[in-house]
């Protein structure tokens, strides 16, 4: 019975992770199609991450007042409306659509990470694997629809609008997988005098800031720097990691960019699914390894020291492995090391870190990609301006 419940817990949270992150991934995969080759892809990243970061940053001060049951319809509405606007391919409608989808993704990550406090390690491994699965399913399905099947880009994006309805499975949790003890925890009134929710309400903003400050060195800095380095690669450098199209297996240069995204997400999926089997206590190891990857890709973009796309594809895949491992180990360490009375708060709060690193990368990438592209054009490599 316990084993069966564990399997269902994993399955439900895998789906929640998949759906929560898939639109974020699809939007990044479609960056070159949304804004074209002449603008930095980091503009899309900026709009895809800024709202998510802001809601995560402010959530510790208000999220306790919204019951989990009420959060799900909000996530569904924001996601569906967001991707519908993005599918119009009109830049001035796409950007607000990206903002709505980003709000849903950030609020969803807080919600489901906090729920893992009640459901334990199986829910966290399911969520982590599902978010990794969102990467590979989102990027590969978009690659398949637009590059292999050559489906209309507007229709391809619109097909994703129905996926957020899968969040409705949340309402089956109590009937399917929750023991009576967890059931009581989830269904208690939001203003109950028990548990971490009331502790949060009774503390002032100063106390909340103090609690957040304790998370900076062990969890937030290593996670945010890993995301900073990998998204600088993905959005600032990868669009310039190009080769003569006749030396590659691709038809268009935008196909190279989409393929890089798919390889990265494959690495993320593998490490988020199985990374917990190789536990790492010192999270700064991942920061160092990802910095090395950034330096290697920067040198390739600037100096063009190899004319083999295969080596770069392997490196992008490895970059994804590092990023996914950092994420799953960070939250696994929290489940193991943090006091249960603080765990729900910590799980929701540390998710600020990945968005912060990605947000900084978006700002830097807006400068970095055009600079690298300008240098390449000046040295006889004009591919970054070609479709």
Swiss-Prot record:
Pfam families per the UniProt record, alphabetical: CLN3
InterPro entries hit by this protein: Battenin_disease_Cln3, Battenin_disease_Cln3_subgr, MFS_trans_sf
Recorded topology in the membrane: Multi-pass membrane protein
SUPFAM superfamilies: MFS general substrate transporter
Signal peptide: 1-31
Subcellular location(s) of the protein: Vacuole membrane
Any GO BP: amino acid transport
Coiled coil: none
Described function: Involved in vacuolar transport and vacuole pH homeostasis. Also required for cytokinesis.
UniProt family annotation: Belongs to the battenin family.
PANTHER family, per database record: BATTENIN
Name the record gives this protein: Protein BTN1
Organism: Kluyveromyces lactis (strain ATCC 8585 / CBS 2359 / DSM 70799 / NBRC 1267 / NRRL Y-1140 / WM37) (Yeast)
């Amino acid at each position: 019975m316990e084993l069966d419940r564990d399997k269902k817990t994993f399955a439900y949270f895998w789906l929640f992770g998949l759906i929560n992150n898939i639109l974020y991934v699809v939007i990044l995969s479609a960056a070159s199609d949304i804004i074209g080759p002449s603008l930095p892809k980091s503009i899309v990243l900026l709009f895809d991450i800024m709202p998510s970061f802001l809601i995560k940053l402010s959530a510790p001060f208000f999220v306790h007042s919204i019951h989990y049951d009420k959060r799900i319809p909000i996530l569904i509405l924001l996601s569906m409306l967001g991707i519908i606007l993005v599918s119009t391919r009109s830049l001035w409608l796409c950007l607000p659509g990206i903002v709505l989808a980003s709000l849903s993704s950030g609020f969803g990550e807080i919600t489901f990470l906090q729920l893992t406090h009640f459901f334990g390690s199986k829910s966290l491994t399911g969520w982590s694997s599902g978010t990794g699965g969102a990467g590979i399913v989102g990027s590969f399905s978009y690659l398949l629809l637009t590059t292999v099947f050559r489906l209309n880009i507007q229709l391809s994006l619109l097909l994703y609008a129905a996926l957020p309805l899968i969040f409705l499975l949340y309402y089956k949790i109590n009937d399917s997988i929750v023991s009576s003890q967890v059931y009581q925890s989830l269904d208690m009134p939001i203003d109950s005098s028990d548990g971490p929710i009331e502790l949060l309400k009774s503390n002032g903003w100063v106390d909340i800031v103090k609690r957040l400050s304790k998370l900076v060195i062990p969890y937030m800095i290593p996670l945010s720097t890993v995301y900073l380095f990998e998204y600088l690669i993905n959005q600032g450098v990868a669009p310039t990691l190009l080769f003569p199209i006749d030396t590659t297996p691709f038809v268009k240069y935008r196909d190279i960019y989409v393929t890089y995204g798919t390889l990265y997400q494959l690495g993320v999926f593998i490490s988020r699914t199985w990374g917990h089997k190789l536990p790492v206590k010192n999270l700064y190891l991942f920061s160092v390894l990802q910095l090395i990857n950034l330096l290697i890709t920067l040198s390739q973009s600037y100096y063009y020291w190899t004319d083999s796309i295969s080596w770069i594809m392997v490196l992008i895949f490895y970059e994804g492995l590092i990023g996914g491992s950092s994420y799953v180990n960070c939250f696994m360490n929290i489940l193991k090391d943090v006091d249960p009375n603080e765990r729900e708060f910590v799980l929701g709060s540390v998710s600020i870190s990945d968005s912060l690193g990605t947000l900084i990368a978006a700002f830097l990438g807006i400068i970095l990609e055009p600079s690298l592209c300008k240098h390449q054009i000046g040295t006889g490599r004009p591919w970054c301006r070609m479709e």
